Regions:
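Conserved N-lobe loop of protein kinases adjacent to the ATP-binding glycine-rich P-loop
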Residues: 31-38
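Protein kinase catalytic-loop region centered on the HRD/HxD motif
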Residues: 120-132
Length: 163
């Protein structure tokens, strides 16, 4: 975004460009001006922000993920509401989704596929041991970092095991 069109979200997050769009929110690359680091900001669509059911689901996503500190899970740093807009601030993961990688490269080498699967299993096992079930594991919610790491994202329809 140009300086003229620069958007500062919640007085702290300088939005740069859209990274993706899902069924209930849009994710943008931003800079956390307070901590001077890149972050991903997920903003609930305005049409859904008036529905308390969607807002509660969004809040549960933030809360579930924020309590899961694991190297294979995208970290959540912040969540809140600003002028009727609900948002989640997450770790920015530079890389591609597993879906994009499979589309671009086709089949993975079996060793790499096994590594990715083991990392996903580690993340989901950790979440499960901490009372959270993801419920939407798919290649589009698995991020592959530029250095070969794996991060599970989007706990949007996660639920507590006690639910």
């Amino acid at each position: 975004m140009s300086q003229q069109n620069q958007v500062i979200f919640n007085g702290r997050y300088e939005l740069h460009r859209r990274l993706g769009r899902g069924g209930m929110a849009e994710v943008s690359l931003a800079r956390d001006q307070l901590l001077d680091r890149p972050v991903a900001v997920k903003v609930l669509f305005p049409a859904l922000a008036t529905d308390q059911g969607f807002v509660e689901r969004f809040r549960r996503e933030a809360q579930a993920a924020a309590n899961l500190q694991h190297p294979n899970i995208v970290s959540v740093f912040d969540w809140g509401e600003a002028n009727g807009t609900y948002f989640i601030v997450m770790e920015y993961v530079e890389g591609l989704t597993l879906a994009d990688t499979l589309r671009d490269e086709g089949r993975l080498h079996p060793d790499r596929a096994a590594e990715i699967t083991a990392d996903i299993a580690a993340a989901l096992g950790f979440a499960h041991r901490n009372g959270v079930v993801h419920r939407d594991v798919k290649p589009g919610n698995v991020l592959l970092t530029r250095d070969g790491g794996v991060k599970v994202a989007d706990f949007g329809i996660a639920r507590a095991i006690s639910d």
